[in-house]
């Protein structure tokens, strides 16, 4: 399937949200870009929700989002529903990766939703409410950002434990380690066979091609390689953590 990987260790469904497109926008434009990222993940992962025992009402919500006919309210609910459906479909916890979250951080995460806050602030609260409510449904949540302070505040307000990590930390390597064989398969797909060392560093959260890149799809997706599946392979047992990578 398009969002799952299996090897001798373990495998988990992966949701990847890239908010980079929202970085240059404000207010409603940024909120639309965030919802667009959720819609694209609904479309990408919809084929994995074919199990007959899943809630048809919830699957229809994801279908509406994937077709681009869902309301903003439905899209805002889609992430939590997607986590629930993926866990039920594969009987596994879900991995949630969010890239460039801080590019659209609202100014007041502690503001009350009394009509005075804009849609971006409401979306931010919705995102962290979803993470908190998902609980044990999430194996790992990784918020990749330059300024983790907003995420730390939001998580602490909800009583959610987290751990900050730099890209070079051994803790990050433990969760995001890839075998040389896995790295070589990706390189073969994109015609970079001789770049094993560089690619290995990138896949553990470093650099590839001289620029920072934290989402595998940014390198692989443009080649439309059918063999690539969104992947996070875990080699260590432990609690479900939240990580902010700076």
Per-range role (PLM):
Residues 151-160, 165-230:
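Amphipathic alpha-helical segments of the small helical/lid subdomains adjacent to P-loop NTPase cores
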Residues 1-48:
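P-loop NTPase motor core
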Residues 90-117:
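Conserved P-loop NTPase "ATPase switch" module shared by AAA+ and STAND
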Residues 20-24, 102-103, 146-153, 232-235:
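Conserved nucleotide-binding/hydrolysis micro-motifs of P-loop NTPases
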Residues 95-99, 126, 139-146:
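Structural recognition of the conserved hydrophobic beta-strand(s) that form the central parallel beta-sheet
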